Amino acid sequence: MIYAYPTEGVWGLGCLPDSEEDVKKICLLKQRKLDKGLILVSGNFSHFDAYLSHLSEDLINKTKSKWPGAHTWLVPANDNVPSWIKGDSDFVALRQSVHPSIIELSEKLNSVITSTSANISSEPPAKNAKEVRNLFGDEVSILKGELGG
């Protein structure tokens, strides 16, 4: 399932990262190349454990010192990161968000979620649920909420 949800600045599109089919559908809807990769977000630090397990304790503590918040970490991708998430990169972007919609969705799914702006590539991102619906119709499940956080 593909979700549309408000974030700190724009509306986002996301899904479970282990669903290659949904990730490809997001890229198709956005007219975005798969090789660009996607960020993984969650409201719960423990959801990142599988993606940080290969890092030193010092680096893990450094991520904890900046999270939750707007800081995005680019870390070397380990074997837990599917190729359709990292794209052509050897790294994966991770962020622990404080936005209520991301916290709620990641808790409901008990997982990180992929995140990318809700827009057609190279076009301005959606700023509200109506714009998301106009862009993607019934292809996405739109969560309630407001931008900011």
Question: Which residues are covered by each model-predicted region?
Answer:
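Active-site-adjacent structural elements in enzyme catalytic cores
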Residues: M1-G149
